[in-house]
């Protein structure tokens, strides 16, 4: 686990996401995400790159084997919501980043609810604790009402059903991404230290031993 470090640039629009995915992840951490009656602060993210001959080759990324209908949003423009269904069950939300035409995105892994806990609980279940309502990427999408139909929307457009406001720079901890079998040791998962909403790290059983990953 690495020491806290501060991102010194505060992003204000999608133009500030035309950077490498790790920098974009820093800029999205601490952002306010709002979706269908629920508002949360982004407390955990993961960066993902792209194709082998691109600037950020990443074998763990959906875009690694090239562009297709499913992953096209990852190729830009920046600031678009890329949604996918994990294990055929859970919708997960990413924000595209990098130059238009270059694959990269940031997965929104967890949020701390600011408003709309009752609305989120109606979607997640009455017994779910507030701190856990948006913990984990599938739970976050469920809490905010994000669906596969939101794929490709502009999260910086005022009339979007899901919006992002990028706030002040935040200190961040970094470590390996959760549950992936390729590039499993890259410290491309970032989170706000001390936040109970951050999900637990779990290494994929298919990943090589720590230190042996690319």
Swiss-Prot record:
Keywords: DNA damage, DNA repair, Hydrolase. One of its GO terms (biological process) is base-excision repair. GO terms for molecular function: alkylbase DNA N-glycosylase activity; DNA binding. The keyword Secreted does not apply. It comes from the Bacteria. Its EC number is 3.2.2.-. Belongs to the DNA glycosylase MPG family. This is Putative 3-methyladenine DNA glycosylase. It comes from Mycobacterium leprae (strain TN).
């Amino acid at each position: 686990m690495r020491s806290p470090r501060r991102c010194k640039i505060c992003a204000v629009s999608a133009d500030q996401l035309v950077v490498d995915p790790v920098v974009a992840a820093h800029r999205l951490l601490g952002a306010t995400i709002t979706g269908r009656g629920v508002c949360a602060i982004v407390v955990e993210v993961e960066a993902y790159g792209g194709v082998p001959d691109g600037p950020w080759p990443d074998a763990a990324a959906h875009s690694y084997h090239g562009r297709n209908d499913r992953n096209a949003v990852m190729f830009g423009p920046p600031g678009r919501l890329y949604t996918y269904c994990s294990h055929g069950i859970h919708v997960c939300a990413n924000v595209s980043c990098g130059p238009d035409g270059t694959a990269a995105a940031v997965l929104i892994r967890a949020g701390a609810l600011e408003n709309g806990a009752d609305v989120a609980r109606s979607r997640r279940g009455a017994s779910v604790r507030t701190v856990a309502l948006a913990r984990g990427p599938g739970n976050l999408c469920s809490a905010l009402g994000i669906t596969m139909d939101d794929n490709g929307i502009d999260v910086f457009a005022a009339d979007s059903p899901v919006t992002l406001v990028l706030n002040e720079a935040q200190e961040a901890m970094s470590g390996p991404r959760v549950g992936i079998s390729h590039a499993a040791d890259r410290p491309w998962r970032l989170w706000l230290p001390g936040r109970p909403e951050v999900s637990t790290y779990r290494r994929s059983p298919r990943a090589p031993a720590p230190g042996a990953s690319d």
